[in-house]
């Protein structure tokens, strides 16, 4: 890591590092989507995954933990969007069940780390209100 990069707090945050992995995973998967999805689901999934990293980075540069916590909450929401899009991509036949599960597992790591970071930044809060990201197994 370069000397100047060490000044970026977000590089040391596990949630940002996991977000970066998610972005690479999403980028690899959407390459095989049909061309007609280029400005639809392909673009949306990439933007949502990128938003995880962007919001953690932006929040880490803020002057207060309260402000940072707000950006962590937005990053959490962006990760949830990726989870939703994983189901839609699977429903359309763009990804396999195994690929969907890989995306959901990556999102689960991010929301867990985001929730922990949120609690650390905002001790008075009990954490981001987290509902299950996974649908009941009755209808995959």
Model feature map: region roles:
Residues 1-140:
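Amphipathic alpha-helical assembly/interaction segments
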């Amino acid at each position: 890591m370069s000397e100047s990069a060490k000044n970026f707090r977000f590089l040391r945050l596990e949630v940002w590092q996991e977000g970066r992995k998610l972005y690479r995973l999403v980028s690899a998967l959407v390459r095989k989507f049909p061309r007609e999805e280029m400005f639809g689901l392909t673009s949306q999934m990439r933007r949502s995954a990128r938003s995880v990293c962007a919001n953690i980075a932006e929040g880490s540069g803020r002057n207060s933990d309260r402000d940072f916590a707000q950006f962590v909450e937005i990053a959490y929401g962006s990760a949830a969007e990726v989870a939703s899009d994983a189901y839609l991509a699977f429903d359309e036949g763009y990804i396999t069940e195994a690929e969907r599960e890989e995306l959901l597992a990556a999102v689960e790591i991010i929301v867990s780390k985001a929730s922990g970071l949120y609690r650390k930044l905002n001790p008075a809060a009990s954490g981001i209100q987290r509902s299950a990201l996974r649908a009941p197994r009755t209808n995959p």
